[in-house]
Structure formats: C-alpha cells, structure tokens
C-alpha cells in the first residue's frame, strides 16, 4: 500500500471513533503518533551509530516496545496504557536539558498533546497502518515528506487558515534568494509547522555540507518558535524527518512574550511568514517601546525581526531577512509608518516582491508581499518587482497553486547584493523608488507599477468597510434632507395660516 493510501486509511479509521471530532482533532491525534514513530526510527539509527547509546526515555515507552507488534495490546488495555501511563510519563518526566536534550524534545512535544481516541481497537488499527511506513528507509522517508506537506494542507483546510502552510513555491524562492550558508544562524520566529526551516536545512545541506563535521554544524543552525501546540509538534516531527537529531531549538512559546530590549542581535538569516490580520492578547504590546506599541501581530513581528538580526561586525555583513507581509503593512499609517521609518533607517530594504491575488487561496484572499532587507546600512533605493500570473492563469486555487518555476524571471533579474544589485534594470515588472520619494510619501510603500496601466484592486474587507461608510453617509444625508423638507413644510404651513 502506498504512503498516501496509508494516511487516508488512518483518517478513515479515526472518523469511526466517537472521541475524535473534526479534521483538526484527527490531525492532532495523528501528529503525536507520527512523532513517536519517527522518534523511534531515529533512536534505532543512533543506537547503531553510537557505542553505549542510552535511550532518552524509558525503554517501555519507545514505539517498538508497545506499538510495533501488530498483535500487541489493543482495546481497553491499549487505551489505559496510552492515557494513564504513556502520556502521564512523557508529560511529567524530569529531564536534564544538557545531559538529555532528546528527552527534553519529547517532553516539550507532549506538553499539550492529547489522545482523542476513545476506542482502543480503532487506535490499534491506526497504529498498525502507521507501521506500514518505514521511516528508517530513506526512500520512504523522502516520499513521506510530500505526504507530510499534504497533511499540513489538510490542517489548514481544517479551519486554521494563514497560520501553518506557506506555499512551497514561495518558501523555496525565499530560501534560494536569501541563500543561508553553513554556520549561519537561521531563524523563523513564527515557524508554524517548519516549512521555511526545513527548506533552509535542505538548502544548506545540498549546497554547503561536505563532511560529517559540517552536518553537525548544520544541526545547530536551525532555530524556530511556535506559539501553538499542534503546529509545534508537527514542526518538531518535520525537523526530525529532515535529519535534525535533537530539535531543541524549536521552542514552544510566543516569541513576542519577552521585552524587545532583552533580545540579542545575533541572527544571520530570518525567513518567515508571520501571522497577519490578527491581534495579540492584552499586555504583549508592553514588551515594545511605548511609541511603537500596537496589538497587531505582523507589526510586532517586524519590529522583533529588525531587533534580532545581527549587526555588521568586523567587515561581516549584517543579518538579512525575507518576510511575507500583507498590503496593509505597506500602506498603513500610525505605528506602521514609524516601523517602516525604522526599517529603512536601520536596514537596507532593497527589494519588495509584490505577489498577485490568490497566492494563499482558498484560505485567505489577502494580497501579500515579500520584503527583503539587510541590517546595518540605511535604505537608498527600494526595488519593486511585480510577480505576474503565468500565461493563461487568472487566479491561483487549491488545485492550481503557484509553482516555483514562475519565479525564474525574478531569479534571472535578481543580481548580487554585494555590488548593490548593479545588474538590475527596470522592465515591465520591475521599478526602482528612491528613499527620498518614499519619505515624501510618508513611508507609504504601496507603490503601483509605473510601467503598466493602473488596475484598481481592493481588498474585499476594505470594499465592505467603504460600502458601509457610504451607506451611513447616505442615511445621514437622507435624515438631513427629511429635516430640511420638514422645516420647509412647517414654515409653509405657518405662512398660509
């Protein structure tokens, strides 16, 4: 049976269980099971590679010792073991972070995990289906990477739009352009399920890793933080699938829940698609300077990114970032203007790629951009590149998503930051705006392509708000008119009398 068929069978079995309600819970259930199976596959490899290797958790809780046997415990006995023994132990085990970092990974992964299944017989069927996938087989592991991406898409379809899945084409393009290298610290402060981090890991491995020592270096380069339990667990599993043995740098928490001034500026590369359109809980904004405080998540993340990027030192270039942000960041005023002013003063905002509508369809229609900047030198010019739809395409959809090959024109045009992008030329898709013009526009970066006829396009929410405002104004005018006519009629009646 193929891996995709196994995953589908697992989801079908879970649908029969009364304890699992909806796609999100099905995926949550599958996630902790996947984690333990992938973890055990890694354990087997480490045990073979290292003499005197000691398992980071008690032997009885390793997948091979309670789940691998198709004829093993089932029914109520299995449920009792999972709920009262396995989960209790993994959540509460005492772990020394230095001596047992892999144990810490397990404890963090299970901190908020939950077994939703109420039928032990169905749970055994799910486990047996998972056992059809061999994670020690590199071919199957590679194939599972594609299936894993489908699981993440399913997660987004389950009503968690915008938080978990950035289209692979965008992730790959951003990593290709930022070009993280061996030894550079790579961070995603809102890492979701780890798409940017996995792609960065693969990029460094394929382009810069030669020796086993290089591989050890790469293991320690990847850093991520994720606020929510389920994507954090999926991200940790994702990192293990890609070959990170101890993904302790994938933290479970809110990156913004710490004073901005307490962060060190030491990150070489940041690649991220922070949540946008949402707001943070009360009090989070107090971690930021008073004049820069806001509850809008994307604005806070942009400030954080500027802060944590490494400053240039001893001839080494400052840290660089590529960040997916909505149109609202570009044209927004108030605190947004202050943030953009700070960005252009502290960093070289050298390129903004304007993405077309529908990139995140069908999950959100918000129009987005990719901002590329490097810390240490102020901005002199901002290059804009308007990414067009491919020929014959009018919009993206779930069945017709954006493809990486579409970015070849940008890649051919891109040039080198080291020479100030001297090879770049303006064309139908690309244009340059001086910082003086940006300042004159009060840092409004929503600048239209001067080489094309203006196409008026508005966000649906903006159109709705504008419509409601117009209706309110019409109602007020109607009331004024009624009052004027009423006064006129009263006056006329009085005169006749």
Spans of features found by a protein language model:
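Conserved Class I SAM-dependent methyltransferase catalytic core
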Residues: 22, 26, 229-232, 295-373
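Non-catalytic, mostly N-terminal accessory regions of nucleic-acid modification and defense proteins
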Residues: 1-177, 181-182, 247-258, 354-359, ...
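Conserved nucleotide-binding/hydrolysis micro-motifs of P-loop NTPases
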Residues: 229-230, 257, 275-278, 327-330, ...
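C-terminal, active-site-flanking charged/polar segments
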Residues: 348-349, 361-408
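Conserved S-adenosyl-L-methionine
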Residues: 163-272, 277-279, 295, 299, ...
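Accessory, often C-terminal, charged low-complexity segments
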Residues: 279-294, 298, 327, 335-337, ...
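Short beta-alpha connecting loops at secondary-structure transitions
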Residues: 220-223, 253, 284-290, 354-356, ...
């Amino acid at each position: 049976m193929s891996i995709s068929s196994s995953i589908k069978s697992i989801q079908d079995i879970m649908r029969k269980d009364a304890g699992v309600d909806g796609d999100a819970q099905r995926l949550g259930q599958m996630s902790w099971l996947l984690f333990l199976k992938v973890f055990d596959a890694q354990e087997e490899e480490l045990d073979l590679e290292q003499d005197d290797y000691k398992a980071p958790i008690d032997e009885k809780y390793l997948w091979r010792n309670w789940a691998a046997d198709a004829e093993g415990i089932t029914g109520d006995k299995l449920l009792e073991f999972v709920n009262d023994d396995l989960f209790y132990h993994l959540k509460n085990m005492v772990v020394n972070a230095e001596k047992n970092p892999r144990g810490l990974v397990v404890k963090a992964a299970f901190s908020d995990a939950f077994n939703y299944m109420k039928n032990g017989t169905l749970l055994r069927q799910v486990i047996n289906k998972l056992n059809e996938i061999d994670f020690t087989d590199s071919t199957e592991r590679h194939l599972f990477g594609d299936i894993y991406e489908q699981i993440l898409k399913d997660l987004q379809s389950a009503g968690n739009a915008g938080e978990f899945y950035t289209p692979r084409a965008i992730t790959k393009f951003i990593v290709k352009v930022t070009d993280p290298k061996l030894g550079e610290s790579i961070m995603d402060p809102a890492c979701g399920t780890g798409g940017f981090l996995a792609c960065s890991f693969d990029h460094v491995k394929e382009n810069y890793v030669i020796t086993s020592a290089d591989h050890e270096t790469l293991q320690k380069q990847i850093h991520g933080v994720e606020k929510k339990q389920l994507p954090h667990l999926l991200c940790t599993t994702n990192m293990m699938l890609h070959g990170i043995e101890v993904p302790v740098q994938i933290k479970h928490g809110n990156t913004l829940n710490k004073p901005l001034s307490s962060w060190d500026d030491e990150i070489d590369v940041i690649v991220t698609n922070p949540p946008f359109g949402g707001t943070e809980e009360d009090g989070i904004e107090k971690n930021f300077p008073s004049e820069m405080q806001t509850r809008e998540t994307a604005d806070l993340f942009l400030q954080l990114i500027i802060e944590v990027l490494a400053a240039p030192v001893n001839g080494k270039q400052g840290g660089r970032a590529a960040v997916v942000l909505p149109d609202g960041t570009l044209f927004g005023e108030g605190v947004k203007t202050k943030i953009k002013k700070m960005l252009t003063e502290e960093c070289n905002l050298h390129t903004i790629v304007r993405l077309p509508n529908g990139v995140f369809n069908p999950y959100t229609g918000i129009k987005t951009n990719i901002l590329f900047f490097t810390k240490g030198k102020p901005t002199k010019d901002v290059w804009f590149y308007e990414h067009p739809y491919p020929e014959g395409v009018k919009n993206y959809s779930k069945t017709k998503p954006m493809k990486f090959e579409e970015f070849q024109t940008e890649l051919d045009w891109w040039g080198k930051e080291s020479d100030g992008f001297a090879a770049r030329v303006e064309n139908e898709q690309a244009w340059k705006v001086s910082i003086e013009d940006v300042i004159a526009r009060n840092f409004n970066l929503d600048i239209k392509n001067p080489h094309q006829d203006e196409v008026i396009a508005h966000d649906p929410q903006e159109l709705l708000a504008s419509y409601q405002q117009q209706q309110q104004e019409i109602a007020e005018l109607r009331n004024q008119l009624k009052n004027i006519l009423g006064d006129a009629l009263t006056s006329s009646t009085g005169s006749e009398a």
